[in-house]
Every structure is written in C-alpha cells, then in structure tokens.
C-alpha cells in the first residue's frame, strides 16, 4: 500500500536496542528495525487513528482539528506507561497548508518529547511528466556522522556546510 502525506512522528529517529532514557525513567521500546540495525524507529503516533474534534470549510479554505488520547488502551502503553493527549490543527488556504501540533502530558512522570514529520512526495506531479524532469533541492546546514547501525555517533566534529 502506498502512503503519501506528512505523518507526525512522535519519538522520531532511532533508539539503540529500543532503549529510551529520560531524567526519571528508562523505557524499553520494541525493536522494529531488523538486523543489522536492531533499533526502535519512528515511534507509533503516526499509525494511530485520530478523532476529528471539529472542522469547517468555506470559499477561503478549510480547517480541521483532530486529537489522539494515549493511555492504557493503546498497545504501545506496555512499553511507555505514560498518558498524554496529542492535538493536531490543519488550515488549508491560498497561502498553503498550516500545521500545528501540541502534546499535553497527563502523567506524574516527565513525558519525553521529540517530534518530526516524515515528508513523502508522490512524483511525477502531473500526468505525462517524467521523474527525471523533477529536481528537488534541499539545503544541508549540518552533517552528522552515523555509525553502522545508523545512529548518530555524537561526534562534536560534525561538518558545518556552507
């Protein structure tokens, strides 16, 4: 199945052997990246069905608010027994897509927070176009060294690109 969009990754990137350490807890996340990497990657929130809270549309655009409540009912709770609510707000207008995300901790323990989007692009964009006609340029500001398991080495000598 093809999936296109801008999924929100809660706990993005990789955790070596699935271990997530915070200032007040250590969580053993499931390893979902096979050998030779053996990491937990990208969390779980992007795979959850969100509830539509409100929406509206008119000639100027549209907006949508969704929410996801993470608690004991989520299968991932066995690995990270915390409670939170994730709220999403999307506005589509002539200016493009505006996206806001908030997360509210509802647990006595500290909630680890790391969020990213994972851009996917369906190309070519129009019928009859060819992939080789598309050029995507993304500026690189910093380059980080990864080890053989695709984990950052923490090398302070990361290249500064100009």
Model-derived regions: residue spans:
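Active-site/ligand-binding surface loops and adjacent short beta/alpha elements
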Residues: 110-111, 120-162
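Structural motif
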Residues: 19, 26, 96-98, 110
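Short coil/turn motifs at secondary-structure junctions
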Residues: 71-73, 95, 106-108, 124
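Extended, loop-rich substrate-binding clefts of extracytoplasmic carbohydrate-active enzymes
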Residues: 32-94
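Acidic-aromatic substrate-binding/catalytic surfaces of carbohydrate-active enzymes
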Residues: 1-33
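A domain-level signal for the structural core that forms small-molecule/cofactor-binding pockets
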Residues: 85-87, 104, 109
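Short, well-ordered beta-strand segments enriched in hydrophobic/aromatic residues
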Residues: 90, 97-105
């Amino acid at each position: 199945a093809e999936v296109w969009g801008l999924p929100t990754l809660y706990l993005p990137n990789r955790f070596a052997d699935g271990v997530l350490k915070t200032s007040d807890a250590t969580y053993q996340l499931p390893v979902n990246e096979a050998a030779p990497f053996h990491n937990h990657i990208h969390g779980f929130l992007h795979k959850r069905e969100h509830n539509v809270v409100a929406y509206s549309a008119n000639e100027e655009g549209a907006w949508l608010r969704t929410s996801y409540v993470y608690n004991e009912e989520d299968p991932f709770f066995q690995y990270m027994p915390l409670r939170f609510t994730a709220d999403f707000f999307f506005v589509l207008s002539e200016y493009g897509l505006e996206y806001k995300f908030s997360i509210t901790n509802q647990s006595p323990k500290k909630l680890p927070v790391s969020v990213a989007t994972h851009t996917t692009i369906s190309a070519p964009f129009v019928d009859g176009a060819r992939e080789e006609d598309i050029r995507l340029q993304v500026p690189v500001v910093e380059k980080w060294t990864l080890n053989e398991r695709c984990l950052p080495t923490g090398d302070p000598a990361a290249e500064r690109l100009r």
